């Protein structure tokens, strides 16, 4: 086999941070001059997370080729330089759909279709296809769910078979939780022992056990885990809870020397690891002594911390080159004191979303920021809110609206895109990377410093082309359009400190090592506004 595979499973509890671990391992392996590919296998029966409630699943991350995926792929992107595509994700829903389609087409020649071998063979095909497409030195495969879940069994069986076929080219990492009982003042290893027993009963013996814990594990505890879980003591690693930032994870794993162990196990020769640049970025990110800036997030799903994961992370990325310390203030659009909360912020971000709930609150936030010259950034639905507010209060169209909110509006300044009226919701939006031509002399041009960019999209609605001329006559600047059909991509409010809306999702391209330019300029504008307010108060 031309590539090596690392399979990452989780046990004891969910939300262990497998995605962050996989992303951090990718960073460490890339620093060894190895090409890494990544694959997330999700056991749920949905075909993809595109139609799932953000409160249940969190953010939907979109790849360049237009695939709606799990938010863990966002972690992969932000930590490493791996290329992500439709080959980087698979769900049980996709697997079963493929198997049943083949059965209907007669490809199994009348055989009884079963989980083994037909479903497991399809899972193995997914693993092989990812490697064939991306051609990595090492493929990291994260298996969603927790050992013991019935949904994960076909994936684990496929991994067992794959390991049997390629025993020298595969390695299994099992991530577990090691709890600390405060009353007894003891660290308990029994849950880890049982989780490994479950995994071994399926036929997979882990090569590495990565223990998540509140505090560092002693040598004695590691020795006990080694003894009862049948792994060498030097193959038991510790991932303690991170106190400052998720971006400390690669530094923590590097300190544990886990990448050296993995490389030796897979037949590579480790090189000295230099993470000084990453360390500097983390220190800058966590520096609380910098200028304090408050950003209000006026969003629909703020109760779920993962619903806007990429937006949150992009703001923090931008705080490093902007040299400030961010405080993110969640503001419910339905709040009675919405405007009072906004008045205490240095900038406002209105993220994407769907549906009528909270729409008018976003309109109010946009108006407040426009009239009071507060930096404001609208993304996707947020941009549409900026345009509708402008039409209502500057064009004097009080009934202007989006057709998503009110299909009967007399002034549909935001309308459904042509061909988007399908009753099938999954995977039918305008998805993936499209070009955007930037207008010279605009805020966007100052940020991008180029006249053509590629950005990722996920939407059905657009600024109504029949209203664009009137909007421009009243001062709204169309700062970016898609050359493929002249779709409005970026709008800017004139004579304003910094107010910009984008139809795309710039948060999907931001990294700690390469923050997105629009987020940088937004945070810089908010910082300047914060300093201006502080100077005014001290006069």
Swiss-Prot record:
Glutamine amidotransferase type-1 domain mapped to chain residues: 294-532
Entry's Gene Ontology cellular component terms: cytosol
The EC number(s) this enzyme carries: 6.3.4.2
Binding positions for L-glutamine per the UniProt entry: 55, 353, 381-384, 404, 460
Binding site for UTP: 14, 188-193, 224
NCBIfam families assigned to the protein according to its UniProt record, in alphabetical order: PRK05380.1, PyrG
The protein's name: CTP synthase
Species the sequence originates in: Chlamydia trachomatis serovar D (strain ATCC VR-885 / DSM 19411 / UW-3/Cx)
Upper lineage: Bacteria, Pseudomonadati, Chlamydiota, Chlamydiia, Chlamydiales
